[in-house]
């Protein structure tokens, strides 16, 4: 019979532990700040014309989408939607206390 070899544990990739050393302190990350948007509070003629021509072509119309695309504030966007509804160029899809969804008016 061949002589028995001593079992040696495989070398581990972790370094040997050296006493209860202090862990590296976590750094605080710099919080990302959103850029302030300077939206209009009143319509100028160019923006109003753009609203009347482009908004009825949107597939989905909400106050937040109008506010984003037209650079107008939320209350102005709600007023604009109310006016487009009165003219009959958009129709309501769903209404909730905090979110109203509209779409372009089709023949149906």
Curated annotation (Swiss-Prot):
Keyword set includes DNA-binding: no
Gene3D superfamilies named in the record: 3.30.63.20
UniProt biased composition (Basic residues): 22-31
Keyword Phosphoprotein listed: no
Gene Ontology, cellular component aspect: cytosolic ribosome; cytosolic small ribosomal subunit; plasma membrane
Alphabetized InterPro entries for the sequence: Ribosomal_eS25 (IPR004977)
Sequence segments annotated as region (Disordered): 1-36
GO molecular function, one term: structural constituent of ribosome
UniProtKB keywords: Ribonucleoprotein, Ribosomal protein
Family: Belongs to the eukaryotic ribosomal protein eS25 family.
Official protein name in the record: Small ribosomal subunit protein eS25w
